[in-house]
């Protein structure tokens, strides 16, 4: 029931993005998506992306902490490469971001229960 409430509230909050009437913008579309797409496409080809020649005049990719190449949630990205373009499907990044909100809600419930809050109070605070 707790998972259902977390998923339902997240779906309501992000309904515009989940149902395709809106999308994330600014840093997501201009920096995060190109970096994630490059890393995922290189991994799908079986190559380690040490250098990114497409950003600026070229820059280290694997050493850039903002590329988030070793972040566990991004390990699924190579499986969602569009074969026609060779790029990552943009919706996948949005779904991963939204999934983090579900994880945050569930973590808050377990934290509050661990601190002695009632089950109703823990659900209400999350």
Tell where the protein language model's regions lie, with residue ranges.
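Transmembrane-helix signature of polytopic, membrane-embedded enzymes
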Residues: 108-126
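N-terminal membrane topogenic signal
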Residues: 1-3
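Membrane-interface coil-to-helix junctions
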Residues: 7-108
């Amino acid at each position: 029931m707790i998972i259902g409430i977390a998923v339902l509230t997240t779906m309501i909050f992000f309904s515009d993005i989940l149902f395709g009437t809106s999308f994330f913008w600014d840093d997501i579309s201009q920096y995060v998506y190109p970096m994630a797409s490059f890393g995922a496409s290189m991994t799908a080809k079986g190559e380690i992306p040490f250098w990114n020649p497409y950003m600026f005049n070229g820059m280290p990719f694997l050493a850039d902490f903002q590329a988030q190449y070793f972040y566990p949630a991004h390990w699924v990205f190579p499986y969602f490469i569009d074969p026609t373009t060779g790029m990552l499907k943009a919706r996948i990044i949005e779904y991963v971001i939204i999934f983090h909100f579900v994880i945050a809600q569930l973590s808050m419930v377990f934290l509050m229960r661990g601190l002695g809050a009632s089950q109703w109070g823990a659900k209400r605070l999350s």
